[in-house]
Amino acid sequence: MIHPQKRLALQLAALGLAAAALAACGKKEEAAPAAQEPPPAPPAAAAPAPGEPLKVAFAYIGPVGDGGWTFAHDNARKAVEKHFGDKVATTFVESVPESADAERVLRDMARQGNQLIFGTTFGYMPHMLKVAADFPQTRFEHATGYKTAPNLSAYDARTYEGAYMAGIVAGAMTQSNTLGVVASVPIPEVIRNINSFTLGAQSMNPAVNVKVVWVNEWFNPPKETEAATALINGGADILMQNTDSSAVLQTAEKLGKRGFGWDSDMTSYGPKAHLGSAVIDWSPYYIHTVQQVLDGKWSSQRLWWGVKEGAIDLVSLAEDVPEAARARLKEVKDGLKSGEFHIWKGPIQDNSGKQVLAEGQTADDAFLGGINFYVQGVEGQVPGGTP
């Protein structure tokens, strides 16, 4: 299987989505970090007893073997164990739905004495807020949410940076000039990734156009397969996805096309089709957060990490990726790390011709967190949004 967001009501209104529909879709949403009043400091957390490890728990939306979103989180959990050794003891519960079950699992984790608890999907937010209020000495971390509390932080990854880099490769290698994206749920995170993929492709090949098929779920391999097949039948020779299984890449492999992995390295699922994987490495953030708790320096905040922090990368490039694309990827990575390059810098127009960023204007995180339009080159309309 994302990846922080502030103005949920505004964003849902912009997308024409009901809150209930979002919850029903399941999984993650990003929150664009923006300035906010810091919450009051939480009560001092109970330190581990002498010789006792820090107990850290993870609640996962999917199975650890999904090959994508949850797989990436669990790899980061393992990295925490490797980094800290006997200073920590980690546990996890997989396939926890975004329902009352989430509250039950989180509450059990707190009662079991876990001092740091990670919830790894957007829909856990109300449950984490409730449980955090009842366990003020426990630290909670919520992936892709936008609300915080004195003992609850929110964090996300800039997945659009990986999408842009995948676009660079796709734009350089397409033969049909038609690219396809299998999209999950029409929220700003996913729309932003589609657009960033398109912008990256256009930076190498202005003639490309991008088709999108929405499956309205995060993890549904049969639907993802159907969507990928439809895109290929529609002329797309390279596919990207913002869904959580390996079905899209596997379909590209089966039908003789190319594609990318998402969230985790998916090379093994389609070795001939695979061009690269836009991966999230949660381990830098998880190691940082555990260290903060161990040092007594943890504080509630909202963070959005990307290439600069080592959280996002495009890995396992295919051997036939041309040198021009490789060179451009290096420039982009270096620029993102230094802060000298901005993916969302004008002039940028939506696909109706309306200017959304003027010449030289750079999007801030609030803008990025509210995207509900397609850029030029993307066909069709955002479901419930603008053309």
Predicted regions and their residues:
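N-terminal export leaders
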Residues: 6-10
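Bacterial signal peptide processing site
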Residues: 25-29
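Extracytoplasmic "Venus flytrap"
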Residues: 46-51, 55-76, 80-84, 91-102, ...
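An alpha-beta-alpha
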Residues: 77, 164-212, 302-323
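Periplasmic-binding protein-like
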Residues: 113-121, 141-143, 234-243, 260-262
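Flexible loop/hinge segments that line or gate small-molecule binding clefts
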Residues: 133-157, 264-272
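Hydrophobic alpha-helical segments within soluble ligand-binding/sensing domains
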Residues: 155-177, 278-297
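Segments of small-molecule ligand-sensing domains
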Residues: 295-387
